[in-house]
Amino acid sequence: MNQVLSKIGQVKANIDISGASTARSASLLCELVELQLMHNPKYQLPQALMPFRQKIFSHYGQDGMLAEIFRRIGEDTQRFVDIGTAPAQNNSNLLLLKGWRGLWADAGIAKDETLPSSIQILQREGKLKICRKLVTRESCRTLLSSRGFAEDLDLLSIDTGYNTHHVFTELLAFRPRVFCVAYNGMLPADLDWAAPYDAKAVWDGSTLFGATLGTISAAAEAGGYSLVGCELSGTDAFFVRHDLLKGRFLRPGDAMFHWEPLRMHLGQMQRHRSAMPLPA
């Protein structure tokens, strides 16, 4: 706790004396807000995931939180599916760097020849497959199974924007060990709500997208998974299969406790541009 308070003081001092650009000042303010948020006593409780958040390739701190989840439950097949991804910023680049194999599924991924060299090498080595199709409730199972990713998954990460919840409920049957699912942090956890399904719909920037954390958590519990934490940004929730919980996580399934409101501004801190290193 004292370390957090000390860091807050350092950032405040940097803001006061920086005389830096507007972008740099905004970055420092975001860092200050993040540090103050992390001062919340519930994040200091034993088994809390929040202290482990770390951004390497993920949009926010998902990299570190996923790493801690797998530290607790262990890695098995080291296979993942990342639905709704971007090559430079996602929840799976760090896993690829650790030697995992997986599938990216997103209609917006650029053509192979325009992807970074490191990604092209992974494709040639058979460590990464790419599906450039719109992932819908009707197509998701076939898209994964036809590419050999219907079973034996350690992680299934889903963020399709508008229809995330509907794709998630369809893929519960695939039984990955861990789900990372985007939720609607604009709405409270105790509201039972999901966006009406529309296969062609995309998020328009409004509150009409996805589903509330409570709705997703209830579907997860019914499907054999428990909520174990949310990213501080209020964007992603983490679910672990019931047989793997074994007292390793703080208040599993408690959506009201784990809920975080949407804080997209936390992604504005200045960092090095994400790029996958070339294999050694």
Task: Tell where the protein language model's regions lie, with residue ranges.
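A structural signal for short, well-ordered beta-strand segments and their strand-loop junctions
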Residues: 82, 104, 157, 178-182, ...
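Short glycine-/acidic-enriched loop or helix-start segments at secondary-structure transitions
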Residues: 91-92, 114, 167-169, 190-191, ...
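A short alpha/beta connector and helix-capping loop motif
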Residues: 129, 166-202
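Short helix-to-loop capping/linker segments positioned immediately adjacent to catalytic or ligand/cofactor-binding
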Residues: 153, 167-168, 224-228
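Rossmann-like AdoMet/SAM-dependent catalytic core
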Residues: 24-74, 81, 140-144, 190-280
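SAM cofactor-binding core of SAM-dependent methyltransferases
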Residues: 50-151, 155-158, 162, 174, ...
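N-terminal auxiliary segments of SAM/dcSAM-dependent transferases
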Residues: 2-39
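Short, well-ordered loop/turn elements at secondary-structure boundaries
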Residues: 97-99, 174-175, 221-223, 233
